[in-house]
Structures are given as C-alpha cells and as structure tokens.
C-alpha cells in the first residue's frame, strides 16, 4: 500500500514539503527498479502505517532499519514472518515479554500492529546484507514526522525507545501527554545492560488502562 492510501497521509502532507515527498516516491521507484534485493518488498514499505491507523495508535516501538536477510523484513520493526527464525534482538524481546507478561510463541508481531502498536523503523528500506545502508539517504524526515504526528494526536500513547538511536527521537515526543519508556537495546550486545527486567509491556498497559484506553494483548 502506498503512503497516500494510509490514514497518516493527510497529516504527513500537511507537515512535509511536497517536493520532499516527491523525492521519496522517486527514491522508492528507482531503488527497487535498479536492485531486486531491497527489503522489505516494495508493497510492504509502509506496512506499519497500513496496519496501525493513526486514530488507533496506542504504542509506538521504534526500530532502526529493516532486517537485511532474505525472507525476514515485513515492514514492521523487529517482526519476522511466522516460519522465519527469530533474529537475536527479537529473541530477547520475546524473552523479556515472557518474564514480564507471559510466553508468546509467534515471531510475527502483526497482531500487535492490528491492536494499535506502531512498529516503526526510522529507515524503511535496506539492501540485502547491508545494514543501515539507506540511513541518511531519504527516510528520516518522513519517519521523524510520523513520530511528531503520533505525539501531536491527543490520545495518550506509549513510546518505547530501545537504545541510543531510538532515544534520539525523544525530542519529537510531548511527554506531558504521553509515556516514554527507555532502556538498552534488546541486541545481545546490550540486552543485559538494562533491557532485561525493564518490563516495557506491563508498564505500557498500566499507562493505557490508567488513561482509559484498551490494553494490548501482547501474547496474542
């Protein structure tokens, strides 16, 4: 689904320069035309926005860029298809979830998205085997604006920022309205430095319930 068909489109168009949005469209067209090994599939670039409409967004989980191996990236941060082994960061997310709330078998986090969890990467495309290769190319003004749009919306939300990169996006969030949860990244390099034991899932639900919003069924 193209960006223009999502519920986020009017707010994005109001916030960003039309010339920049044209450059985004051109980048997508040229990148996928020139290289067949770009992830996720072109139709899934904006999957997070498609599956989590702005009015239904309750939680935002920031990622950096898509998984760069074949068959992994879905357009949802940290998620992989059901039949794909969980990458190390996702293994640790599920480990913390099990300790915090309970065990979840599925590696596919689509059901989180459809409950109002925006699984947003800061960079929306990646070439095969080249992590962060598209960082700084085109995407950040758009994804930064999406964080701002979610923050400017009045409904109380939880923003989950794992690691220094995600935490650099804190500047776009109005903490008088929303809860920001920060910890180390779930990567094996840092998970034992504050990610494990941080209880983001139960803390998010506690906030949502306190604000009169439906909690997330993280085990679904």
Swiss-Prot record:
It is found in: Cytoplasm. The active site is at residue 65. Keywords: Cytoplasm, DNA damage, DNA repair, Hydrolase. Pfam families: UDG. Excises uracil residues from the DNA which can arise as a result of misincorporation of dUMP residues by DNA polymerase or due to deamination of cytosine. It catalyses: Hydrolyzes single-stranded DNA or mismatched double-stranded DNA and polynucleotides, releasing free uracil. This is Uracil-DNA glycosylase. Its EC number is 3.2.2.27. One of its GO terms (molecular function) is uracil DNA N-glycosylase activity. HAMAP family: UDG (MF_00148). GO terms for biological process: base-excision repair, AP site formation via deaminated base removal. GO terms for cellular component: cytoplasm. Belongs to the uracil-DNA glycosylase (UDG) superfamily. UNG family.
């Amino acid at each position: 689904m193209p960006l223009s068909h999502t519920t986020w489109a009017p707010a994005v168009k109001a916030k960003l320069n039309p010339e920049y949005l044209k450059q985004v469209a051109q980048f997508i067209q040229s990148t996928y035309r020139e290289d067949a090994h770009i992830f996720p599939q072109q139709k899934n670039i904006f999957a997070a926005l498609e599956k989590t409409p702005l009015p239904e967004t309750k939680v935002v989980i920031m990622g950096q860029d898509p998984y760069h191996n074949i068959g992994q990236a879905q357009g949802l941060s940290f998620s992989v298809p059901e039949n794909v082994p969980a990458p190390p960061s996702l293994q640790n997310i599920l480990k913390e979830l099990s300790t915090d709330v309970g065990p979840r078998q599925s590696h596919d986090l689509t059901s989180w998205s459809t409950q109002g969890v925006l699984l947003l990467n800061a960079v929306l495309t990646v070439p095969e085997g080249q992590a962060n290769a598209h960082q700084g190319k085109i995407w950040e003004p758009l994804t930064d604006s999406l964080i701002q749009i979610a923050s400017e919306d009045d409904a109380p939300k939880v923003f989950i920022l794992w690691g220094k990169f995600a935490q650099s996006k804190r500047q776009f969030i109005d903490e008088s309205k929303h809860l920001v949860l920060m910890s180390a990244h779930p990567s094996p390099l840092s998970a034992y430095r504050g990610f494990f034991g941080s209880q983001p899932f139960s803390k998010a639900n506690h906030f949502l319930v306190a604000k009169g919003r439906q909690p997330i069924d993280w085990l679904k």
